[in-house]
Amino acid sequence: MRNRMAPENPQPDPFINRNYSNMKVIPPQDPASPSFTLLSKLECSGTVSAYCSLNLPGSTDPPTSASRVAATTAIRRRHKERTSFTHQQYEELEALFSQTMFPDRNLQEKLALRLDLPESTVKVWFRNRRFKLKKQQQQQSAKQRNQILPSKKNVPTSPRTSPSPYAFSPVISDFYSSLPSQPLDPSNWAWNSTFTESSTSDFQMQDTQWERLVASVPALYSDAYDIFQIIELYNLPDENEISSSSFHCLYQYLSPTKYQVGGQGSSLSIFAGPAVGLSPAQTWPNMTSQAFEAYSLTDSLEFQKTSNMVDLGFL
């Protein structure tokens, strides 16, 4: 069976068994010869000819590096030189800028004609002047902020209020400083003065804090009073039972001052400090719940004999 794909009349291959004896071989040409340069130019045609410039010896085309330098120089020449203004021109420009920072086109034309300057130069000057003013304002504001911040750091901060529940008001030292500097006398006392109420948590203050507070306040009375008599008089618990309440550090404020009133032989006991206002009828729980309350003179004074009560009635 004959193959359909095979040609019916096969032709011999032209490159097989070909005789090259009649062919002429072109000898290599010298690149310096003008014929080689002309041939290379003819081979580069159309748009490719611009990119096929061969820098061969004897070629008339300039080198590529020189052309690039020339193009860069031409671009640099396009930038205008810096305009220098005379003193009169500068004053005229500044005067108009002080009036308006955005002059319209008519003002720019008039000013350009008056100063013999191009209108574009006047326009550029105003634009640069606005930028300069904005930059100066930013620098001034930055300096002001830098001056304010160090001054705030140097200001002493006010002491914060102590969050401790043991802090109370008014302070005892402030109370005693408000007393008159003259010698103590019943006629000079303000019997209507009151104490600010304090919560029961004040009695739970630690011993060391009470001792520091008491040490900062001078003793009001010089005569010492027996603490055991106070305990018996006010039905207080034993000293061992109240060690946590720290009443033992307030002995100096539980001292009496004795005065003879109206020629009568009875002496009255006046108590100051935290024990003010306590009567024998009050028990320990009542005292803790009603600490630092204000009482009248008859409630705060206690005589040796309860039957002999003296009402002085001072205002």
From Swiss-Prot:
SUPFAM superfamilies, per the entry: Homeodomain-like (SSF46689)
Q: Name one GO molecular function term.
A: DNA-binding transcription factor activity, RNA polymerase II-specific
Q: Which residues bind DNA?
A: 78-137
Q: Name one GO cellular component term.
A: nucleus
Q: List compositional bias (Low complexity) regions by residue number.
A: 136-147
Q: Does the keyword Cell division apply?
A: no
- Primary site of residence: nucleus
Q: Where in the cell is it found?
A: Nucleus
Q: Which Pfam families match?
A: Homeodomain (PF00046)
Give the residue ranges for region: Disordered.
Answer: 135-163
Q: Where is the composition biased (Polar residues)?
A: 154-163
Q: Which PANTHER family match?
A: ARGININE-FIFTY HOMEOBOX, HOMEOBOX PROTEIN
Query: What family is reported?
Result: Belongs to the paired homeobox family.
What protein name does the entry list? Arginine-fifty homeobox
